[in-house]
């Protein structure tokens, strides 16, 4: 599913400079299939258009990472094997450019987990919290996403100094 800050911003009808595109998959069989396609055919095996690669993909148990060149600019491309939480299937109609986005609950959970991992890294400029604020989740999605994140990381969710 299309996730990360870029998906959040686009889903809210906003725009910002983004130098990365993130996709998340939690289903083991689906990730195995994606890995095999990329190993056999490169990233081109996943797309309907030819890509200009900035670097060849690296594939491991955590994800598939590469960069693609768009108008001469390298854009980081990641398919993250999200093994911490089970991602819910997004509803039809939640697509951006034909790709379904994470559910609001999973957007909240993934951003809370990312913030907990990166809060001390000043180079991130607390972007995960900014993304959460941009998405303006309703109370149901916020509570459900927080519950998913707390189930994984415990009470450190919501208590990091940057929160």
Q: Where are the regions that the model predicts?
A:
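Compositionally biased terminal segments of proteins
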Residues: 1-163
């Amino acid at each position: 599913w299309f996730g990360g800050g870029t998906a959040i911003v686009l889903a809210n009808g906003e725009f910002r400079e983004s130098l990365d595109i993130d996709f998340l998959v939690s289903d083991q069989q689906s990730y195995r299939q994606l890995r095999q396609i990329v190993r056999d055919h490169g990233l081109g095996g996943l797309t309907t258009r030819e890509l200009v690669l900035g670097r060849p993909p690296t594939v491991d148990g955590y994800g598939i990472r590469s960069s693609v060149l768009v108008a001469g600019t390298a854009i980081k491309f990641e398919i993250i094997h999200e093994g911490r939480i089970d991602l819910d299937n997004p509803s039809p109609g939640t697509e951006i450019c034909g790709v379904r986005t994470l559910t609001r609950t999973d957007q909240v959970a993934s951003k809370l987990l990312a913030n907990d991992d990166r809060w001390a890294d000043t180079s991130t400029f607390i972007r995960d919290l900014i993304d959460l604020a941009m998405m303006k989740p309703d109370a149901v999605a916020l509570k459900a996403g927080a519950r998913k994140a707390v189930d994984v990381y415990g009470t450190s969710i919501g208590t990091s100094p940057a929160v």
